[in-house]
Regions:
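N-terminal amphipathic alpha-helix/helix-capping segment at the start of soluble metabolic enzymes
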Residues: 1-27, 120, 283
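Active-site mouth loops of central-metabolism enzymes
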Residues: 19-37, 56, 75-83, 139-152, ...
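Alpha-helix-loop-beta-strand connector modules within alpha/beta enzyme cores
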Residues: 60-81, 114-126, 186-197, 281-283
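Catalytic alpha/beta core domains of metabolic enzymes, predominantly
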Residues: 131, 139-286
């Protein structure tokens, strides 16, 4: 079922499903019971464009810290729970806007019911999360190994457990580090349930490998109309996850806003330190709320022509460069003034 037809779910003051905009999620890597550090990281992520934040709750200290954290942030908080149902209940009591559990590792039906009852009392959603690395032995054996079909079977089994307890305020996530398996699993599960799907490639890797795997996986899934929230899982600063997620959504035409920076790959004609210049421009435009394309080109010979599809651009030359707007050269400036002149044009932008 495509995102236009999924069930509408409220997470704090945000709404997903039913064709609502796809929201970006990340996860803190601080110790959750270190309230000051956790709040600082969440607020940085929110400023960068994070819509929903998830925090690990490995112990009761972390669960009890959630109320203090909640009072100092402005985006919904999801509590990530494994194994101990008491932590899930404590997280709910301390104000979590959603909890993430795998009913398969919470324990007996009575324990799952206790968690469901607590969520029902606060009317907060439960995210049912299944990972290819934690599939039940019998499902793996039945399918001859870890498969997309097995991931979906496990997820639906967990959903039915909670539905049978009288609750359907649910979000579902099915993840694998195998990109094509993850894509197939999402294609299959979207035909079986109407709950919103949180999409991500788990254990995708470091900045380079993680971005490539996530871009391919999320792109293939989202472009089919599947997925209601996303996370780009990276081994690194969570801020990088937000940058990547925003770019993926913008590239797919699923979100507007924010300046898109394009740059040439350099060649023997390059007459300027283009790599440094492109990075400086990307950092410089991060806080400018325009929905335009900025080109950074390496030479004044081909630069103006190649920058025609951008709204504005710069092209480097020997000790000087050009400012190009809508394909027309509007000024020539010294090399060391290119960034400041470009920023001035952006701050005074008019169509």
């Amino acid at each position: 079922m495509g995102r236009n037809d999924t069930k509408v779910i409220h997470i704090g003051d945000r709404v997903i499903g039913g064709g609502n905009p796809i929201l970006i999620q990340s996860m803190t890597n601080t110790k959750t019971d270190d309230v000051e550090a956790t709040v600082a990281q969440i607020n940085k992520l929110a400023d960068a464009g994070c819509d929903i934040i998830r925090c690990a709750v490995p112990n009761m200290e972390a669960a009890n810290a959630l109320s203090s954290i909640k009072s100092k942030i402005n985006i919904p908080l999801v509590a990530d729970i494994h194994f101990d149902y008491k932590l899930a209940i404590a997280a709910i009591e301390n104000g979590a806007d959603k909890i993430r559990i795998n009913p398969g590792n919470i324990g007996s039906t009575d324990r799952i019911k206790a968690v469901v009852d607590a969520a029902k009392d606060k009317n907060i959603p439960i995210r049912v999360g299944v990972n290819s690395g934690s599939l039940e032995k019998e499902i793996v054996e039945k399918n001859g190994g870890v498969t997309a079909e097995g991931i979906v079977e496990s997820a639906i089994d967990k959903v039915r457990i909670i539905e049978d307890l009288g609750y359907d305020n649910l979000v579902v996530s099915i993840k694998s580090s195998d990109v094509l398996m993850c894509v197939k699993a999402h294609e299959l599960v979207s035909k079986e349930i109407n709950y919103p799907l949180h999409v991500g490639i788990t254990e995708s890797g470091t900045i380079i490998s993680g971005n490539i795997k996530s871009s391919i996986g999320l792109g293939l899934i989202l472009n089919q109309g599947i997925g209601d929230t996303i996370r780009v899982s990276l081994t690194g600063d969570p801020l990088e996850e937000i940058k990547s997620a925003k770019l993926i959504l913008r590239t797919l035409g699923l979100r507007e806003g924010g300046i898109e920076v394009v740059s040439c790959p350099t060649c023997g004609r390059t007459q300027i330190d283009l790599i440094s210049l492109a990075n400086q421009v990307e950092n410089m435009v991060a806080d400018i709320p325009l929905n335009i394309k900025v080109a950074v080109m390496g030479c004044v010979v081909n630069g103006p022509g190649e920058a025609k599809e951008a709204d504005i651009g710069i092209a480097g030359g020997i000790n000087e460069g050009l400012i190009i707007k809508k394909g027309e050269i509007i000024k020539k400036v010294p090399e060391d003034k290119l960034i400041s002149e470009l920023r001035n044009e952006l701050l005074n932008w008019s169509e």
